[in-house]
Every structure is written in structure tokens, then in C-alpha cells.
């Protein structure tokens, strides 16, 4: 198959998803669309793949990489401080452009359940979480089309068309017990999340 493959964003072709999943299983890098911007995905449990992703983007090694999930249960099993507030926040904003940084046995990890068929189907086919970082050189403008990512050294690009009208990433917040902290403001304002989180949702 070609490096750039047109992929139906509403009903992704099974053979393309299978091909992308195989590449990920072999330690490769695959660029995929989300409902916000395009991202570079790899196997989060493959250290060589993570290092290659960092090198490809020129990303600092100590900068954390978030993970995509295909269900709330995947995250619930990993989070060691899961509570009712986190669950209600997930149910309100997922799937959607919100990344939650939660504590796990492996440290603090960002999780996101995207509102886009391609990453969801790929996660399901891969059978695990996917490490994902924005498909651009570190510090550069986020990409909203496959063409904008073509200079990155990856194994496959799934072209699902324009991901959004503007290159605005997901909002990132950290939840520590019953407190939230803004890491990055994106599609959803921190004030909206803060108001919802503290509006009678605590255990």
C-alpha cells in the first residue's frame, strides 16, 4: 500500500485499519486524524517506537506522551485514584477533545477518547491503548490535513480529510484526587470544565 492512504472517516475500511494495526504492532509509526488535529500514533509499550516518535518530531525525551483509548473502562482499569467525579467528567466530555492526566501504577498518563471513527477503530483493532502526539515538528503548527504531515518520517498516513476548521488541540487537565489543574487550554475552556467538576460532583 502507499504511504498515504485515503480513509473513510465515517466508516473506515477494515483492510486499511488492519494494515495500520499491523504496522503499529511491528513498532511502526502511523499518522491518523482525530476530531481536532492529526497525530502520530505508536505502541505505547514499545520503547523503540516511542524513541522513534520523539526523534521524528524533535520532541524532548522527558516530555510525556498521551494515550488514546476506545472506552472509559480501559482507563478505569489503569487509574489508581478513580472516583465518581472522574467518571462523570468522562461521561460528559468523552468521546471528545478532552485529555485527562490521571495517576496510574506507571506514573501520570494523559488519556483521551476521541470523537472520530478512525482512531477508535484502530484502537479496537490494535487491542490496546495508542500513544499519540500531534503530527508536527515539536513547537510547530498543528496539522489539520494529511498533506501537512507528509514531511514527517512515518510508515503510514491515514488521510481522513480535514480534521477540523482550525488547528486547535484537545484541552488537557490533570486530576489529583478531588482537584483539577489546567495543563493546556484547547477546544473546551478550562472554566467550563472547572464549573462542571466542582458543581456537586465530588465523592
Task: Give the positions of each predicted feature.
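Active-site-adjacent structural elements in enzyme catalytic cores
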Residues: 1-203
